[in-house]
């Protein structure tokens, strides 16, 4: 029996499914794939920003500091922190020289 033509019918005062092939491996595989698809769809819609940012930028956190002297790195960190600390509004304006 096809899944599209499956009908629930009242059987002895209960609702039951009149299909005998529910143990068919194809039906089991389709059910597992459907459940996995639903779980992945929900996770994608909950965490899409994190997921796509990870795939786009990898594990990097900010600009590369490779080849930059430690003093300049520390100065940049201080500027970033002071810009965040000094501003109470939602927008921060940072001018780079």
UniProtKB/Swiss-Prot annotation:
Its main location: virion. The modification Phosphoserine is found at residues 64, 82, 93. Glycans are attached at residue 20. It comes from the Viruses. The M2 protein from most influenza A strains is inhibited by amantadine and rimantadine, resulting in viral uncoating incapacity. Emergence of amantadine-resistant variants is usually rapid. A lipid is attached at residue 50 (S-palmitoyl cysteine). The record marks 37 as: Essential for channel activity, possibly by being protonated during channel activation, and by forming the channel gate and the selective filter. Homotetramer; composed of two disulfide-linked dimers held together by non-covalent interactions. May interact with matrix protein 1. This is Matrix protein 2. It comes from Influenza A virus (strain A/Ann Arbor/6/1960 H2N2).
